[in-house]
Amino acid sequence: MISKIVKKIKQRKLIIRNMRDINSLIRTEVKIEQLQYMALNSDRPLIADECQLGSPVIVSLTTFSKKIHEVHLAIESIAQQSVRPDKIILWLDEDEFAMENIPSILIKQINRGLEVKFFSNIKSYKKIVPTLIIFPDSYIITIDDDVLYANNMIDILVKEQNRFPKMIIGHRGHRMTFDGANLPKPYKQWDYDV
């Protein structure tokens, strides 16, 4: 009798967990559709009308050929922030891209304030190194090309930067882990989202 009750409880927990997963997937798909619609149809600038802090807030990202047709969604999620950045810069590999082969949806975003720049292929460092060189006194937020950001991310980062002005502020990070010889383990073995 007790084992049947325990089994039923486990089944219900599994159903509830599956329902949460389905709800999460639906919310994500709805958000993607909304961002896609905005990217295709909006004339609203992606960036702030005027600098809101003492130094510009710059969102910097990079992508590559396999993700070039989806990166507009991450960019659009930044454009929908409660606090919009002063610049959004998409860095592309100068050997892989030219303005002539950029997808038309990114051209629409360029017309709304996106800046596309080209740099040598230094992998993911491309989203921070050239931006630091050109804008050393700015607040730089690096983002991933495959994440849809909550609409208050920049607001939270700016508030935390104001609280801790001499610190590097992160929205999400990973903790390096080390092996027995005190050498860093491979990236995939780090502690994620700490």
Tell where the protein language model's regions lie, with residue ranges.
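N-proximal low-complexity "stem/linker" segments adjacent to membrane-targeting elements
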Residues: 2-80
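Residues at the starts of beta-strands that form the adenosine-phosphate
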Residues: 56, 86-87, 139
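Short acidic, S/G/P-rich loop/turn micro-motifs used as interaction or catalytic elements
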Residues: 64-68, 95-97, 147-148, 176
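Short, acidic, metal-binding catalytic loop of nucleotide-sugar glycosyltransferases
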Residues: 75-86, 94, 108
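Active-site-proximal specificity loops/subdomain of glycosyltransferases
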Residues: 91-138
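Conserved catalytic core of nucleotide-sugar-dependent glycosyltransferases
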Residues: 131, 148-194
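Short beta-strand-to-loop acidic/aromatic patch adjacent to the donor-nucleotide binding site
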Residues: 137-148
